[in-house]
Amino acid sequence: MSTIDFEAKLYEINSWTILRLPEDASEKLPSRGMTMVSGTINGVPFKTLLEPDGRYAPGQKPSHWFRPDKTLLDDASAKAGDTVHVSLEPTKDWIEPEVPEDLKKALAASPKAEALWNDITPLARWDWVRWIRAVKTPATRQKHIDVALDKLNKGMRRPCCFNRNLCSEPYVSHNWVLIEPMQATEKMTT
């Protein structure tokens, strides 16, 4: 697949700096769901998971987004509000997800589930992590961890009934859709 080049504005949603791909750039990706990419921002290299923005209804233009970390932003001399030059190339080499501490602890207490966790692909681990983090309350999150352990103990390699095209990060989404920067500003002022 060829390199996808574009310019995009960095937005702040809540306290996170977000880069949302233009729809025409997102269209060139191999998947509407999460996609692993290598690329550059203002010439500074990175590798990350692109999350879907959750827009998929008729008439909507779906896209992807990611949260550049502080080091990448500093090295690229970029901040929220700036327009940056981005080059992306999809890759099949998936980086490991950051496993939340509560899930690490639960896996460590369940050797059978942990053994399967270590055997599944990084993509499958991303599915589990995204499914677990996609909830807002601690009680529901714990329920998702308990269900994940039960399924892993039964040999199930992926969560069931999880739409990979939705935005699974509750801090920057509402009803599984990435919050628009204007909505984030309106929420903060009301």
Give residue ranges: language-model regions.
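Mature exported/compartmentalized surface modules and terminal targeting/interaction regions
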Residues: 1, 62, 79, 87, ...
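Long, compositionally biased stretches
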Residues: 1-62, 76-103, 160
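A conserved hydrophobic position in a structured secondary element of the catalytic/binding core
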Residues: 21, 67-68
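Short glycine-/small-residue-rich flexible loop motifs, especially phosphate/cofactor-binding loops
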Residues: 36, 70, 114
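Short alpha-helix capping/helix-loop boundary micro-motifs
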Residues: 69-75
